[in-house]
Amino acid sequence: MRKLALVPIQFYRYAMSPLMASHCRFYPSCSCYAYEAIENHGLLRGGWLSIRRLGRCHPWNPGGYDPVPAVPTSRSSSMAE
């Protein structure tokens, strides 16, 4: 399911985005952010992170560097090390 959700993002990035001027106020771009968020966090959490990011991408936001949050690690694996 995750890979299926990434197909429209890839299509946009490689087929449609080059035809339009860059409008994203953030780095990485919103499409790169969405791809990475879904790839790292899964469809539900990554999709939610992507929607929140798109909501922040508007002319009144200063933009800037906004990376995808790191994947949380479980406490048991960090205690075992």
From Swiss-Prot:
One of its GO terms (cellular component) is plasma membrane. Pfam families: YidD (PF01809). It is a peripheral membrane protein. It is found in: Cell inner membrane. Keywords: Cell inner membrane, Cell membrane, Membrane. Transmembrane segments: none annotated. InterPro entries: Membr_insert_effic_factor_YidD. Its main location: membrane. SMART domains: Haemolytic. Could be involved in insertion of integral membrane proteins into the membrane. Belongs to the UPF0161 family. This is Putative membrane protein insertion efficiency factor.
